[in-house]
Structures are given as C-alpha cells and as structure tokens.
C-alpha cells in the first residue's frame, strides 16, 4: 500500500510541474484566461491521483517492477515490457485459452457487450446477446500450477533479467525472448490468421539457425524430434500436426482464408499447443545447449538440431553434464 506521505509529496511535486507547464504555455502566447489557476492545478492533480488510486484498488493484482538506473522514459518503457513478458510467460505455463483475457489494464480489449440479429428464410428475426467478463481469468489454482512448473518458470523467467537490468544476453537467450514475445502476441491477437503465423514464428525462432528450402517437412521433423525427446509425443501425432500447421501457415501467408469457423478453431488450437510445448521443452533444451557449448551461435544451433534429428538427445545431455563439471568452480 502506498503511504499517504508519499501521495501528498507526489501531489506537491506534480502540482508544481503543472503550474510550470501553464506558465510556459502563457509565455508562448496561450490565452491566460483559458489556463488553470494555481488552485485549479492543485485540484486537477489531486483528482487525477485520487481516480487512479481508486482504479488500482479494484485491480485483482498489481505488477511492481524495479528497473536499474537509467533515463526515466526508458525505465518506464522497460517496466511495461517486463510486465508484458511476465504475462506471456504465464500464458506459456498455463496455456493460451485460459489466459487469453489476462492483459495490462490499458491494453485494448474486445467489446464487453455485443448483439447479433439475423433473419431466417421465413423472415423471422432471431436475436442473441453476448457479455464478456474479464474476471476471473486463468485457472483457479494458477499459483500452484506455476510452482509445480518451477524449473520452466526459472528458465523462462530469466528472460526478464536483461529487460530490467540491461546486460549482454547470449544468442540463445535472445532467441528465447523473441519466441516468448511471439507466443504472447499470438495469444492476444484477435485475428486468427496472424495469430497462427505468430505461433509458427515462435517455433521457428527456437529451432532454426538458418533458412533452408523444403522447410515444411523439416519444420515438422524438428518439432517431432524435440517433443519426442522430452516424452511429449506419446500418441505419435506431433509430426502430422506440425506438418499440417506449417502448410496452413504457408497458405495464410499467401492470402488463403479459412472456409469454416471449425477449421480455424482446430488450426488455432493445434498452433497454440505445439508452440507452447516447444517453448516448455526449449526451456530445458536451451539450458543443456548453454551448459554444453557456452554460447552457441546460429550455425551451432543448426548443427545441434540436425544432430538431435540423427541421434536423439542423450548425446547433448552427456555433453551438458561434462560442461557443468568443466565450468564448475569446485573440482
């Protein structure tokens, strides 16, 4: 809770700033009779702060982000980026569907109330009403779910560090950040077509070090290889789903549209689930790569992915174990 003394001091500082803005406006020729007096400036600032605090009290939760010392405008921007990425990580861990309505308070949302009218062949008008609620969102026991995913939460959460405390990131770390953002953008995108393309982009950013011809089968193969290695393909359907997903993505990029609502619904579900599973597996896969090869670049990532296709994951696990011993301060 914000202390009253802090609020009073903030009102005093912001009032002085507003009065100064009024003086500068008058100096530049703005009519004085149309500006605020000092008392009006004070009332304006108080009212603005009061309404904002009241709105905050109604929020189910509030994010508090501390950014390392830097320019105020940049630090504010980074705080927003960090909060958005934190929400994206929650979306990855809990799934796209139950977290679709989780958003920042000022983010754009759909209409809360809508209506639909249509007439049948007999001229009878049928009406329907729709009301959306932003609460509750996610799952009831979301905290417990996140705690159970402790390893993935730690690794994916590490993507927040270079945002609030600018440090040099590894190549794989930047790829993970990009993929998380692609996934989050896909979840919140109201357009099904662009959402599917973004889900695929998240996977491509994770598993491809370079562009190659014939990517459709290569894409499906890499998704299958990684998910199979982490026991996430028990029904042996990942390859077929990934193949169909990439074909759908290519068709959409070239202007094709879905013919039915069911078709788009099925495609978006496959895209979100495959992208989510790839991110969760990559949290562990990337950790192994970093332990084995320190900071693999594009070429090394491509080499590793091809070797996983040929030999599976055991060799990388062994290399990661050796890397941990090699770089350990205790020998």
Where would I find each of the regions flagged by the language model?
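Charged, non-catalytic interaction/linker regions at domain boundaries
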Residues: 1-194, 201, 266-268, 273, ...
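Charged/polar positions within long, soluble alpha-helices
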Residues: 211, 250-258, 280-291
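Short, hydrophobic/aromatic alpha-helical segments in well-folded domains
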Residues: 182-185, 198, 241, 248
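Flexible secondary-structure boundary motifs
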Residues: 198-236
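Histidine-centered, metal-coordinating catalytic motifs and their short helical/loop contexts
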Residues: 235-265
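A glycine-rich, aromatic-flanked flexible loop/lid motif
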Residues: 172-173, 212-223, 238-250
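Short, surface-exposed helix-loop/turn micro-motifs enriched in polar/charged residues
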Residues: 191-195, 214-215, 260-263
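Glycine- and acidic
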Residues: 68, 181-187, 228-232, 256-261
């Amino acid at each position: 809770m914000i202390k009253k003394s802090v609020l009073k001091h903030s009102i005093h500082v912001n009032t002085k700033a507003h009065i100064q803005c009024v003086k500068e406006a008058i100096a530049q020729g703005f009519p004085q009779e149309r500006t605020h007096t000092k008392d009006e400036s004070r009332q304006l600032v108080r009212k603005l702060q009061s309404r904002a605090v009241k709105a905050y009290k109604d929020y189910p939760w509030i994010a508090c982000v501390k950014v390392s010392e830097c320019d105020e405008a940049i630090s504010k921007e980074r705080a927003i980026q960090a909060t958005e990425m934190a929400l994206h990580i929650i979306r990855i861990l809990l799934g796209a569907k139950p977290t679709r309505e989780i958003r920042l308070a000022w983010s754009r949302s759909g209409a809360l109330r809508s209506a639909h009218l249509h007439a049948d062949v007999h001229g009878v008008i049928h009406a329907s009403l729709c009301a959306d609620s932003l609460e509750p969102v996610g799952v009831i026991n979301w905290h417990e779910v996140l705690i159970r995913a402790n390893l993935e939460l730690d690794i994916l959460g590490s993507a927040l560090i270079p945002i609030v405390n600018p440090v040099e990131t590894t190549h794989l770390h930047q790829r993970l950040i990009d993929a998380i953002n692609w996934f989050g953008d896909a979840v919140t995108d109201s357009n099904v077509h662009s959402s599917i393309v973004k889900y695929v982009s998240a996977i491509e950013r994770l598993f491809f070090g370079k562009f190659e011809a014939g990517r459709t089968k290569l894409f499906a193969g890499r998704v299958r290889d990684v998910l199979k290695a982490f026991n996430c393909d028990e029904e042996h359907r990942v390859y077929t789903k990934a193949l169909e997903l990439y074909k759908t993505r290519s068709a959409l990029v070239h202007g094709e549209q879905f013919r039915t609502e069911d078709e788009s619904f099925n495609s978006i579900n496959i895209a979100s689930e495959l992208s989510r599973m790839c991110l969760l597996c990559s949290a562990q896969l990337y950790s192994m790569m970093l332990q084995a090869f320190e900071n693999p670049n594009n070429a090394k990532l491509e080499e590793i992915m091809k070797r996983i296709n040929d030999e599976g994951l055991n060799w990388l696990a062994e290399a990661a174990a050796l890397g941990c011993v090699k770089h350990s301060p205790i020998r």
